[in-house]
Amino acid sequence: MNRTAIFIGLFLLTLSGYGQNASHQRTVAEERVHVTPSSATVLQWFQWIEKKKHITLSYNSSQIDLSRTCRIKREQDMSVSELLEKILEGYQFRTTLLSDDKLLIQIIRQEIYCLSGTVTESGSGERLYGAAVTLENQSAEIKYTLSDENGIFRLLVPEGHYKMKISYMGYQPYERSLYIRRDSKVFPQMSPLLFELEEVTVKSHKQGDELDALTPASLLSFSGNDLFSQIWILPGVTGTPSGDNFQVNGGSNDENLLLLDGVPVYHPGHLNTLFPVFNGDAVKSMVLHKGYFPARFEGRLSSITEIKLKEGNKQEHVQTVSLDMPAASVVLEGPIIKQKLSYLIGVRRSWLDLFDELLSEENRMNHSSADYNAKLTYAITPSQTLEAFAYGAKDEYHVPTEEKERLSLLRWNNESYQLRYSGFKGRLGYAASVYYTSYSNRVHAAALGYDEDRYIQSGINSTNVSTEFNYSSDAMYNARWGVKYSYDRYELTNDDNEASVRLEPISQFSLFYDNHLRINDNLTVQVGVNFIGYIPRKSRSYYSIQPRFLLQYSPSKKDMLYLCFSKMEQFYHYLRFGSVALPTDFRMPSIDGYKPRSADHYEAGWKHYFDNGQLELSAYYKTRRNIIALHPDAFYSDAEWKTFIMTGSGYSYSARLYFQKYWKHWMVQFSYTYARSMERFNEFRDRGDLPSLFDIPHQWTGAVAYKLNTRSSFSLGGLVNSGKIIDMNDWEAIEASDFRKLRRPLNYRIDVGYTYKRDFGNRLLLFRCGLYNVVGNPTEEELLNFYSVSWGNGCLPYGGISFRF
């Protein structure tokens, strides 16, 4: 009996002790603290609680983002548990008392949900590439991303209330509130701002993780030369105002690749260099990659430009008619099935040559340019899209004959066709495409000195199939991977006694994998690799591993430091022997011992952002291998290319400054580039490093625009460049002793422009006019080609009008 009583007593005493501990635990968690309005990191709040209540908080730091900022908006008294819930909003946790002064915080695994969707333009249904999407929770934490080339975005966040904001140049900001408790889809639509772009508005800006993005967008038009005319204001980019034959980072013209809806256009230029590369009225966006290349890109050393065509208005039928100095164009778009199936058709043609019969022979144009775009877009579901597009361009130089007929001396042709499917489901996005693209260059034998009535032709055609995926596993990690296969068929012509032609079939496949890791809110890393197999049927095969690396660190909200590395290889060589491209030019894939060109690009930079502007300082170093050049002593009417082609290596480096600032009525952009591009060849070993043909040590560019009112604006732009190296003297090859020694004088140019914009309800009007080279000393290339219609001293008037209804 006594034993039973003792046992019961001990049991009650144990319960009493447990109750006291539980009571003490509740007391610690429920003790009141006085909190004033303030903002601090999670770690600072933990330290403040420990100091105020003289306790120790125990937790696993790998499970909590201690650098996250938590803000208390008003002064109040609250319990420790209530304060912890504020500090750890979005986390599921429980507290346990370990001792009288030690409280354990245990994090229960946090559920992460995927918010995905497609950003489109209201009314037309156009998907928007590069829209900045942000989610802000109640603690003012922000998650952000950019919509991809299909307008698709994904954000991974825990359950909670969020404010969603979307911004895109030329569109009204979008905002809505969301409560996310499961994987969800949204399809925000953005309203365009009429005529938001000014005459000179090229932005090299960073939104989120994007580096060196050029994404113009306009409700009306990129009429005339808008698409490329101001690209030269970016540091490291030089070229003619029409966008033809531009150079990037000291590289040659053929080191740049243009992708039209993902399809390569092998020769985008036109005989009439006033004629812009593509029809701006049909273009939706443009992105220029130079320096860092995402792993999905390959094939060129200097730059890759993505140009996206519009999809066609899904709500109503719209027509855009444009007439400017080089061409007239018509773009038709509209729904076939509203909200589901849309069309886009664009046609352009030069018109100055139509008046040749009224002019004397020496003043005739004798050449014409024309192109077309056609596209069908079918929204199978809000998250699945099927697209088909076609593009064609023809340039022809002709002369009248005695029979008053036109003899075609030279003709360039481009053709591209593509079928593409894309979509997303939750955290997984996917796309597949098949395309065919071709380029041909045909010249009459008489133009090359042959006494024959026939044509000589060269070209390339390519068939490609590809598929790719991207996946977001959580808020910190994103992966993108894919595979491509292409079958290329080169038609090569030698300028020998018979202008012989040979066919070279080549297979190529590539695999890429890209990882994007956000280590914290200030530090992101992108690491990828592209593996390529290049397999000619008649020559040696090559296999290439191309790593890519990008590190971005933001020490503050207004500053970003970046470091990047890209290895690129190019399986194509091209040397043009005259002022225009001919089929007898040196075009050579990586066969017959001509190894692929390769480059390693290292770059570091700093960007500072301020209200409506930015300042950027950057520097790069780039190595090149297996480059080619024409020997000055060569007589190149020979079937043996190796008798006049030299191979060597090179390097380039640069320090660059870029500034832009916008005010209510003013806009200023300025860039300065100091750069050197050097090459070395065994044939000139005793000369050491020689400047390349694209070595431009100093380059200044600037633009100023003033907005008179909501409809009118003036602009002034200019450039000053060091002269290029001379490789031809009066159309004759220079002596070997002067090889790469002579340089042209300083080039400079000042342009002025005026823009008038007005909307009449559903009708929109844009008028542009101005003068290129009001004062200046333009390059010989510009005088011979671009300024074919000019006033005195190479001053070129331009004008254009667009009407949308």
Predicted segments, located by residue:
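Periplasmic N-terminal accessory/gating domains of Gram-negative outer-membrane beta-barrel systems
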Residues: 88, 146, 172, 187, ...
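Flexible loop and strand-edge segments within Gram-negative outer membrane beta-barrel domains
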Residues: 385-462, 496-504, 582-583
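C-terminal beta-signal and adjacent terminal beta-strands/loops
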Residues: 711, 720-731, 749, 754-805
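Short, acidic, small-residue-rich periplasmic hinge/interaction motif at the N-terminus
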Residues: 20-22, 46, 52, 91, ...
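Short, acidic Ser/Thr/Gly-rich low-complexity loop/linker segments typical of extracellular
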Residues: 138-152
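Surface-exposed extracellular loop regions of Gram-negative outer-membrane beta-barrel proteins
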Residues: 396, 440-442, 539, 553, ...
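Outer membrane beta-barrel strand-and-loop segments of large Gram-negative receptors
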Residues: 456-468, 502-512, 595, 601, ...
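Gram-negative outer-membrane beta-barrel transporters
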Residues: 521, 621-623, 645-729
